[in-house]
């Protein structure tokens, strides 16, 4: 019989990025015993790849900035499909979370008068991103990690044990959420990657903070950990996913050399005067300003360049349009034969900064070293080649906006694996502040749920046995399918058929291919290796991938099915056969649930889809927009004074949806 370790905690946080660590810190500050489970090394979360900054309306660069302006920008960027309550909470609370991070030791760049420096980013009306050069995510993780260590030192002084109230499990992967007989979360099942040891973490509350799904695509800025674990685990436990069709393709990833294709090129380059040019040398973004943004963006190079020094009297350059618009424009230029030699376009800061090469190296140190070391390109003297790369998923676990609670009792989510905050497209910089705002709220939500329990749920032996058998299954098929070959076909399918531009025929083909891949995933097999645990599970990346394939298959089906259903183009979802936004579709959320046998998700279950109406925005919030702008997004009945005028909301932004879901 396979040995299984057991550990008891109050709250288990899955993921050690910005959202996970902030949730864990909050639960620990409230006196709970917390386990943090990190798929990779502690401190190596994908958050470190977020380079540009954390968006927060502190008004340091422009005193006209405030939470209302930030809220408007976020809703515009998401094409009004955002959960408006989440956008409101984020805009209001982001400054406090950034100042809190500074109090914990974060070393932000400063203005001349000593305030936190804020930089420009696409879709933000004012310079709003608090930053540390172009390494902001790294500084965030360093600061949160040091906060965890400081709390562990406090616990050692008080209890004689550094891990008395917060313990980090590095290189550990969760494969199942465990539930008791009443359907409540009671813990998680995981394995330690180094040894292959199985571990059960008993806990009444679980916070999911696992990030995104990028490794389901061939070209991505995401690191190897991003296999849709949180999305899939939530589906398998009975939770729902929201608007999974919206996948953000960051407009600027490296395109050469092939070994680094997709690696992120931060938006800070464009925020710091960088411009995009095609093979003819033309600044082509002026040809791609959509009607909904035309009033706010410069139509000449001269005005766009003046904006950097005089933003009050000029409009911003179109290189700073929201990411979905820029990615589509680059894609169009390449398809028209005006791309760079390696299938991208040119991004340049040469002769664009007043301080010349020295200022480029100071403001963009990571980008300078990245291109110099990986592509032998000196960005102070020559342009970069860039192209779209799968970067972020706006869809995610459906949660209550105030508490982060999912539909399964005891399950909470924050960060990229949760849905709603960003609508159909995320603005750059909103991710890092999102992690802090909703990481804290999910941690508090878990504590409040825990405090309200009359009894702690027990972990059924049958749940553990089933999870163990599922994890061991690939070893029973030594001559089965190669997990790497299956993964490569899955990635190619998503990249080619569910990418930036989508059509009904290609999406239908993708679903057919995914259905065929389902049978292959069920037959994936591995052989034991001669290190680690005695049964050959230690240091076994083939086995790890075999288990991750289940998750990538589920989230890929959710993305493709939702993309086929939504017959419009909005944000990160572009349908070539339905090229315009529809005000009627704006009122619709697409909800994915797992149907069939969740204990056999590859062969016995599939993703079901249904439509769910959006909750009307609260009246005071809709009053922040001009009626002429609202007409671009809303139906006539939704406009102020219409039959379905806004203001009928509950103020929670998610309760009505949750109530409707609970009645199914």
Predicted feature residues:
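An anion/pyrophosphate-binding glycine-rich loop and adjacent beta-alpha core
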Residues: 240-373, 445-451
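Glycine-rich loop(s) and the adjacent beta-strand/alpha-helix scaffold that form part
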Residues: 205-263, 425-445
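Glycine- and aromatic-enriched mobile tails/lids
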Residues: 2, 7-9, 18, 26, ...
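Short hydrophobic core segments
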Residues: 12-14, 201-210
């Amino acid at each position: 019989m396979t040995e299984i370790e057991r550990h008891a905690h109050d709250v288990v946080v899955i993921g050690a990025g910005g959202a996970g660590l902030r949730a864990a810190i909050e639960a620990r500050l409230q006196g709970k015993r917390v386990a943090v489970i990190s798929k990779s090394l502690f401190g190596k979360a994908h958050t470190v790849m977020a380079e540009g900054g954390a968006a927060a309306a502190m008004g340091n660069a422009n005193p006209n900035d405030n939470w209302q302006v930030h809220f408007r920008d976020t809703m515009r960027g998401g094409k009004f499909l955002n959960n408006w309550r989440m956008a409101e909470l984020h805009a209001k609370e982001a400054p406090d979370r950034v100042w809190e991070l500074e109090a914990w030791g974060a070393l932000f760049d400063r203005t001349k008068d000593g305030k936190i420096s804020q930089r420009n980013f696409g879709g933000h009306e004012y310079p709003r991103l608090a930053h540390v050069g172009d390494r902001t995510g790294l500084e965030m993780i360093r600061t949160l990690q040091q906060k965890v260590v400081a709390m562990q030192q406090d616990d050692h002084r008080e209890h004689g044990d550094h891990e008395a109230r917060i313990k980090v499990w590095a290189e550990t992967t969760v494969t199942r959420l465990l539930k008791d007989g009443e359907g409540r979360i009671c813990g998680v099942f995981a394995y330690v990657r180094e040894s292959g040891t199985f571990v059960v973490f008993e806990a009444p509350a679980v916070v999911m903070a696992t990030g995104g799904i990028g490794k389901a695509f061939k070209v991505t800025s995401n690191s190897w950990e991003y296999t849709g674990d949180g999305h899939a685990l939530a589906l398998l436990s009975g939770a729902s996913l929201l608007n999974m069709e919206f996948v953000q393709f960051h407009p600027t990833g490296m395109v050469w050399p092939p070994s680094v294709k997709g690696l992120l090129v931060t938006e800070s380059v464009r925020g710091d005067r960088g411009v995009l040019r095609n093979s003819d040398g033309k600044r082509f973004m002026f040809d791609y300003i959509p009607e909904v943004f035309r009033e706010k963006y410069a139509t000449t190079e001269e005005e766009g360049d003046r904006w950097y020094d005089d933003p009050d009297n000029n409009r911003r350059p179109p290189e700073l349009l929201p990411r979905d618009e820029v990615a589509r424009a680059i894609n169009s230029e390449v398809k028209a034969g005006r791309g760079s030699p390696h299938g991208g376009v040119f991004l340049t800061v040469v002769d664009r900064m007043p301080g010349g090469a020295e200022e480029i190296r100071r403001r963009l140190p990571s980008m300078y070293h990245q291109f110099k070391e990986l592509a032998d390109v000196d960005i102070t003297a020559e342009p970069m080649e860039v192209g779209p790369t799968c970067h972020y998923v706006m869809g995610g676990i459906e949660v209550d906006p105030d508490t982060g609670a999912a539909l399964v009792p005891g399950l909470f989510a924050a960060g990229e694996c949760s849905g709603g905050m960003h609508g159909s497209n995320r603005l750059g910089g909103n991710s890092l502040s999102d992690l802090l705002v909703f990481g804290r709220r999910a941690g508090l939500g878990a504590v409040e749920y825990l405090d309200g329990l009359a009894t702690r749920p027990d972990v059924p032996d049958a749940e553990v046995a089933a999870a163990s058998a599922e994890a061991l299954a690939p070893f029973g098929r030594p001559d089965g399918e190669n997990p790497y070959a299956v993964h490569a076909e899955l990635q190619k399918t998503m990249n080619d058929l569910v990418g930036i531009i989508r059509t009904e025929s290609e999406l239908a083909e993708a679903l057919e291919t995914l259905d065929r891949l389902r049978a292959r995933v069920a037959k994936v097999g591995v052989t034991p290796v001669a290190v680690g645990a005695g049964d050959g599970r230690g240091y076994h990346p083939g086995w790890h991938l075999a288990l991750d394939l289940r998750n990538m298959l589920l989230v890929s089906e959710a993305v493709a099915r939702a993309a086929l259903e939504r017959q419009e183009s909005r944000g990160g979802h572009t349908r070539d056969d339905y090229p315009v936004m529809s005000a009627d579709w704006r009122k619709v959320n697409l909800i994915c649930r797992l149907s069939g046998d969740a204990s056999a998700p590859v062969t016995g279950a599939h993703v079901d889809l249904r439509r769910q109406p959006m909750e009307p925005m609260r009246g005071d919030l809709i009053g922040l927009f001009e009626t002429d702008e609202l007409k671009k997004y809303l139906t006539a009945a939704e406009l102020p004074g219409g039959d379905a005028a806004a203001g009928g909301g509950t103020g929670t932004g998610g309760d009505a949806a949750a109530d409707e879901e609970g009645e199914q």
